[in-house]
Each structure stands twice: as C-alpha cells, then as structure tokens.
Amino acid sequence: MKKYTILIPIYNDRESLTKLIENINEELNGLNAEVSILVINDASSQQIIDTYPNLENIHSFEIINMKQNRGHARCIASGLKYIYEKKKFDYVIPMDGD
C-alpha cells in the first residue's frame, strides 16, 4: 500500500481548512492508500482546530505551529523537512489550505 502525506500550509483560514479536510476524507473513501495530513500553521492569529471527528479515511492528522509568521514558501520548506526527517512515505502532496 502506498503512503501519501498531504502538506497544507495555513494562515488565518480556519473555515477553508475545515472544508478541505472534510473533502479530502470524503474523496479517499475506497482508495487503497495510507494518507496522512500535515498542516503547517504559519503563526495564525485565529485558533486552528486540531481535532476533527470522523476522519476514518485519513491515517494520521498533525499540526505544526510556527512560532512566527514566515510566509507560504517557508512553511512548505519546514513541512518538507519535517516529513523527510519524521515520516515514512512514498509521495508528498503540497496543497494550499484555501
């Protein structure tokens, strides 16, 4: 089974992130793959929801909170570094949170 990690940088867009997570979970129904989601919170001033119920098609969900706002590209770079050091995967899918 292939292992995918979806990398989502986010800044002050809680509603879009919630919809995106739910849509990803729905689209994965019946797919023979192990999919994890890693959200990089770019020091949002909004509270980012860190628990989503009923994510039966998503293997793991994790949020990394940046200490200060560093921008979209820096979030992706930080996320990729984390994934390469900490995760076992076959593919990484960077995806905007909005």
Predicted regions and their residues:
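Hydrophobic targeting segments
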Residues: 2-8, 17, 24, 35-40
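A generic structural motif
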Residues: 31-35, 59
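Residue-level signature of catalytic and energy-coupling elements of molecular machines
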Residues: 24, 79, 98
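Hydrophobic/aromatic residues located in beta-strands of well-ordered beta-sheets
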Residues: 37-39, 63, 92
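Short, well-formed alpha-helical segments that are part of the catalytic scaffolds
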Residues: 13-28, 47
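A conserved acidic beta->alpha catalytic loop
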Residues: 41-49
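Conserved donor nucleotide-binding strand/loop of the catalytic core
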Residues: 52-86
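Short beta-strand-to-loop acidic/aromatic patch adjacent to the donor-nucleotide binding site
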Residues: 88-98
